[in-house]
């Protein structure tokens, strides 16, 4: 990791730049990170305290949007040794708090840079506990996660994407 990357600070946004829309029309707004675009999948949660890079690259999460419940994510950064596979299987990643700057000597990229490189849509600033409780009580919904720096979203289209997604087989 170079000096420029270490000195990056998070930018506070005045409006939502990321959104999660569930198939039951529930909408969660936050700040987008990672790849700008949209992805649809099954929304699940993970309660691990560590290992976010391994989780995102784990084939068992294929087709899923992972809601991370631990609030401090990103402090290890990303590297080439902490991958579960050569391919990224996850469709999206949701975090409660802003991504922490990496402070690990093995870090090659920030989590945000790594998500962008691997075309994974990310979202921060959500009440991940509320989403986790929803999933626990109602089951894993289909959802569409979207990241747009302009904060403009076609919610009707995102709901339809979520509803029409065939699900995991």
Predicted regions and their residues:
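RNA-binding accessory domains that recognize and position tRNA/RNA substrates
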Residues: 2-169
């Amino acid at each position: 990791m170079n000096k420029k990357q270490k000195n990056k600070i998070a930018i506070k946004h005045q409006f939502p730049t990321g959104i999660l829309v569930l198939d039951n029309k529930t909408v969660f707004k936050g700040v987008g990170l990672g790849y700008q675009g949209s992805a649809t999948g099954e929304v699940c949660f993970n309660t691990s305290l560590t290992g976010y890079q391994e989780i995102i690259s784990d084939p068992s999460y294929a087709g899923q949007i992972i809601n991370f419940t631990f609030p401090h994510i990103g402090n290890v950064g990303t590297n080439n040794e902490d991958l579960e596979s050569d391919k990224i299987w996850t469709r999206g990643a949701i975090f409660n708090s802003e991504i922490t700057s990496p402070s690990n000597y093995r870090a090659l990229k920030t989590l945000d840079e790594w998500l962008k490189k691997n075309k994974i849509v990310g979202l921060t600033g959500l009440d991940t506990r509320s989403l986790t409780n929803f999933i626990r009580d109602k089951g894993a919904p289909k959802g569409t996660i979207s990241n747009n720096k302009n904060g403009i979203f076609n919610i009707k289209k995102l709901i339809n994407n979520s509803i029409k997604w065939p699900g995991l087989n």
